[in-house]
Amino acid sequence: MHSKVVIIGSGPAAHTAAIYLARAELKPVLYEGFMANGIAAGGQLTTTTEIENFPGFPDGIMGQELMDKMKAQSERFGTQIISETVAKVDLSARPFKYATEWSPEEYHTADSIILATGASARRLHLPGEEKYWQNGISACAVCDGAVPIFRNKHLVVIGGGDSAAEEAMYLTKYGSHVTVLVRKDKLRASSIMAHRLLNHEKVTVRFNTVGVEVKGDDKGLMSHLVVKDVTTGKEETLEANGLFYAIGHDPATALVKGQLETDADGYVVTKPGTTLTSVEGVFAAGDVQDKRYRQAITSAGTGCMAALDAEKFLSEHEETPAEHRDTSAVQGNL
């Protein structure tokens, strides 16, 4: 299969790009992935609670609902959405080549690619984490918080930013109490989120505290968490039936490692004010190239930019035989 433009991703950036490209009659193909990077189609927004700061929704909207609406809108204009994960790409020459996880030896081609793969939640890899992962440990409170093993139990959230505050607030609906562990002596969360968290009757925030080890019961479920005060070195074992990580994200750039220029943290480098990457014809949008803002609205904005950049690129190169275009010479020249 050959396409003028392929979008890899399923979040606000990917679907906004798809909407613009489909309306421009460029017939975009969007690979939303099948649990790509361990995240369901829709990206990080599917793991959040109510979104209060996305324009157009004065009463707020749930993350999953917002992504469902974006997907429906991109499909309405003709975007072809494929629920497969792109496993490898070859950006050395145009048309670019790529293959999916389910058919790794069957290559497809595209004149341009928009990378909107987002970022994935970090894990601490504590002793016992692998054993009790999804048996008490999660990186998504919205996905897992309502399951029976967490109801009316003491739950722990690790992190000090807005995500941690949001996850903890969400978990108060189900847990008997929520303890938030913050490595430093203050929260990084915004003032409004910090105020809500610190004043919630079902939340306790423990500063200068880290997780050390996860322990479980004879049923194979998490039952305790060993924590340590980093100022005194004193350890304590907490009874806890749930542990939720909210400690940041890593950009999903393994797919293009060694082919696109990335920064020290692994984020794709784009030319300032654009979504152009180090390879002509490849564009990056959303959290995969944004480590500063990481908001749904900014992701959508860069998705729009990527679509317009791709449309301009395609119009300028439609007369050039794609099979003779070697992209290696332009790599790294931002």
From Swiss-Prot:
Entry GO MF terms: thioredoxin-disulfide reductase (NADPH) activity
Its EC number(s): 1.8.1.9
Coiled coil segments of this chain: none
Keyword presence, Flavoprotein: yes
Pfam families registered for this protein in UniProt: Pyr_redox_2
Catalysed conversion reaction: [thioredoxin]-dithiol + NADP(+) = [thioredoxin]-disulfide + NADPH + H(+)
Record note on cofactor: Binds 1 FAD per subunit.
GO cellular component labels: cytosol
GO BP annotations listed: cell redox homeostasis; removal of superoxide radicals
Cofactor(s) this protein cannot do without: FAD
SUPFAM superfamilies associated with the record: FAD/NAD(P)-binding domain
Claim: Disulfide bond is one of the keywords in the record: yes
Highest taxon of the lineage: Eukaryota
Disulfide bonds: C140-C143
Annotated FAD binding sites: S10, G11, P12, A13, I39, A40, Q44, N53, V86, C143, D287, R294, Q295, A296
Family recorded in the similarity comment: Belongs to the class-II pyridine nucleotide-disulfide oxidoreductase family.
UniProt xrefs under PANTHER family: THIOREDOXIN REDUCTASE 1-RELATED-RELATED (PTHR48105)
Protein name: Thioredoxin reductase
Originating species: Neurospora crassa (strain ATCC 24698 / 74-OR23-1A / CBS 708.71 / DSM 1257 / FGSC 987)
Gene from which this protein is expressed: cys-9
